[in-house]
Amino acid sequence: MPDFSGTTATTEIHVSETKPTNNGRYKIVGNHLLREFSNEEILKDIAKRIADGRRLIIPIGLPQSGKSMFIASLIAYAFRRDNKEDNSCNFAVPGDRNASGVETILNALDKNDVLPSTRPDEMTITDLDMESRYRRKRIKITLLDFSGEDVERLTGKRTDDDQHSAEKIKQILAACIAQRAIFAVLTPVDEQIQEVGQASDFDITEDTEMHSFITGLRTSAPRLYNMTKFLLIITKWDKLPKRVSPEKYLQLHRNTLYSEYSGYSRSYGLIPYSVGDVVGNTIIKMVLRSPRNFWYTLYRWCTGKHVLPWWKRIFS
C-alpha cells in the first residue's frame, strides 16, 4: 500500500510561488527518464502547469493493462477522427508538437503500429487543450504517465531494490493530487475469460493492486484523496464473451473496487473501454467511441457542462 504521508509541504510551496506562463513552454515535455531531473525540477514544471490552469490526468495501471494504447486512442480521437462524422470538439497541443510526443504517436498510428509500453523509470508528459464547438469553456489538461512496473512498486506488488523511481513518483503525485487531479484507473478484462461471473487469479490480482493504490491514498493522505477524482476504466472490454453492464462486471470481477465505486460515488466514474482490433503489434482497426466517451466525461467533470447542448444530445 503506497504511503503518501509527509509528501505535500514542499510541493504546495512550489505551486503557490509559481506564476502562470500561459504559453505551453515547459521544460519537461514528452518522454523522459525520471532520473534525468531532480524532484525540484519536476515539481517546478508541474507547478507551472497548475498555475496555467491545467488539470492533471494520471493513468494508473499494471503492466499489460493497455495503458499505452489507451493514451494513443485518446490522441487518435483528438487528431485523426473524421470531422464529418464528429466535429463536436477541437483539440490543440500547446508549444512544440514534436517535442510533446504527439507527432510520434500519430506517426505510429498512421502505420497501424501498436505503441510500446512505457518503460520502468520513464515519465511521459503530454499537454492538450480541448474545447467544445458549442461551449465557450476550454479545458487544459496534462497527461502524466508512468510505467506499469513503477505502479507495481507503488502498490507494493514489486518489491525489488530499485525503489528510486517509485519514491520520486510519490512526490510528483502528491503535487498533482493537491491540484484536483483525476486518476484514470485502468483495469483490463482477463483475455482468458471463459464465463462472466467467475473471477480468475488475474481478476483477483488486478482488484487487489488497484484497490491497494486507492486505499493507500485515502489512509495515508486523506486530504489529498478528498481532492481528487477516480475514473475506473475497464479496458479490453471487447474481450468479454457476454455483454453485461460495466457496474455488473465490476461487482463480479473487481469486488473491492466495486465497493469503492459504490461507496464513494461522488468521487468516482466508470466507463468500459476498447481501442478496437489489435493483432500482435498491428492495429487492424481503431474504434474511437471509447475515447470519445472518455473526453466527454472529462469535459463534464472539468466544466460541469456536457460537450453537446441538450438539443444535440437528443437528436444525435
Predicted feature descriptions by range:
Residues P63-Q64, I71-I75, I141-L144, I177-P188, ...:
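Short, hydrophobic, well-ordered secondary-structure elements
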Residues R54-L56, I125, R138, M227-K229, ...:
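Extracellular structured ligand-interaction cores
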Residues P120-M130, R136-Q179, Q192-Q194:
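Switch II of P-loop NTPase G domains
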Residues Q171-A175, A181-S316:
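Conserved GTP-binding G-domain of TRAFAC-class P-loop NTPases and closely related GTPase folds
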Residues F37-R119, R135-I141, E149:
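Conserved G1/Walker A P-loop phosphate-binding module
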Residues L62, K111-P116, D129, R254-Y261:
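Intrinsically disordered, low-complexity boundary segments flanking structured domains
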Residues M1-I60, Q64, T215, T219-S220:
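Short, flexible boundary segments at extreme N-termini or domain junctions of P-loop NTPases and their
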Residues F91-P94, F146, T187, S274:
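A short hydrophobic beta-strand->loop->alpha-helix junction that borders the nucleotide-binding pocket
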